[in-house]
Amino acid sequence: MRLPVLSPTALRDEQKLLYEDMRKGIKSHFGGFESVRSDGALLGPWNPWLHEPKFGKPIWELVKTIVANPSLASPVREVAILVTGAHFRSAYELYAHVLIAEQRRLSDEKLSTIIAGQRPTDLTGPEGVVYYFASALVNGGVLPELTYRAAVKEFGANGTAELSYLVGLYCMVSITLNTFDVPVPD
């Protein structure tokens, strides 16, 4: 870990406001994995964002926007997030979202295959579209036209845009976690 975990009692004023908002959001949207220490300190990507509130606050606003009233089903979202986390080999990201995906009833076989960077054979139609979409984006270049059309057909224009922003956000989350070598909790 390259940054010390910030204790809530040691936060500057600008960090305190962000901390309180993050705590509230974590409680309502990010359960099922360890994201807050017993002393209230935030783990995962939230700690680096607290260190730099001028960057952390707008990133957190994007997170809140993307998790508020999503149009995409939870299992589909988790496939996109796991494809992204696996691409970046982001340990904390994979730890957290494997636990979430298990709660959303994605099979162990499906999860382990995605984490290995491969396409599971038992993906549903929507999951398959998302797998190809997220894989193409994280591997760089323009999203292939047929992949884009398949997403629009499956999720509509707004759902496709949401999927793009979701993958982009989790690229940023994964890079943040990797930059600061954020570990999986003990």
Predicted feature residues:
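N-terminal hydrophobic signal/anchor transmembrane helix of membrane proteins
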Residues: 3-6, 22-23, 56-60, 79-96, ...
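Short amphipathic alpha-helical segments and their helix-coil junctions
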Residues: 56-70, 113-116, 144-153
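Acidic/histidine-rich alpha-helical segments that form the ligand environment
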Residues: 124-164
